Every structure is written in structure tokens, then in C-alpha cells.
Amino acid sequence: MKLLDSVRYASFEPYLSIRTTHMAVIRYLVRDVDVAMEFYTNMLGFELVEKWGPPFAMVKRDDLTLWLSGPGSSAARPLTDGSKPAPGGWNRLVLETDSLVSLMERLSQSGAHFRSEVVSGPGGKQVLIDDPSGNPIELFEPSGR
């Protein structure tokens, strides 16, 4: 048991230097940083933190910082196996809302693409939308609101 514990702690050691003061950071690959910035700031309540030329911007909402990496950013470069990172997929960020219906109406009026109908469960109700580059966002209204 002692050897197993030392292996576990030894493998954790490199992670002790990870900065923990700001852990909620997500990077999304986007087709157009300006379009993505406008969507997240005007439609979902994020604020612009920084913009580094056309290929990169950071937006923030509460404790979440979202990195928007466009074509030409280092995150969009081909990987060593030749594959090229692209927007989309199913991993997603989840944004809580007090009124899913109101937010859906606003997004629908702006032409947002909904991936799903509203799904209800014991914890609340949710719907999936796409940002302008096809990255999924889950909008979630907890039960009891």
C-alpha cells in the first residue's frame, strides 16, 4: 500500500505548479473571431477582456474566461499527426440561466441554431445551441427557478 501511495503522489507532483487562481478557462476554435466575439458579448452576456489581432480574443462572464481562437492562431495549427483542429464537436460549456424560455426567444430572434429541443430532467431543463462557428453551448435552467 505504501508503494502505491508513493506512485500516486509522485505522478501528481508535476501538477502542483498549475495556477489555481483562475481555473475556469475554455478554448473554442472559431471560424471568425469578430463574429464569435459579437455573439458571446451581445447575446450571452460576456465582456471582452483582450483581443490580439484577428486570430484571438478572450471574453469573460463571471469566473469563466473563454478563449476564441480563429484561423491563424496557434491553436488552429495542424497537429503532429497531420490532423487539423476545427470548431464543433459535442464537448461544450454550460451556461446557467434563470429563464430558459426568455433566453431561447432572444436567441431565436437573432437566428441562433438550436441543436435540440428543450430536455427536462430532475435537475432542470436544458437546450443545446451552436455558436456562429458550430461550437455547442448548453443553456441550463436549474429546477426550482
Spans of features found by a protein language model:
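Short glycine-/small-residue motifs
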Residues: 136-139
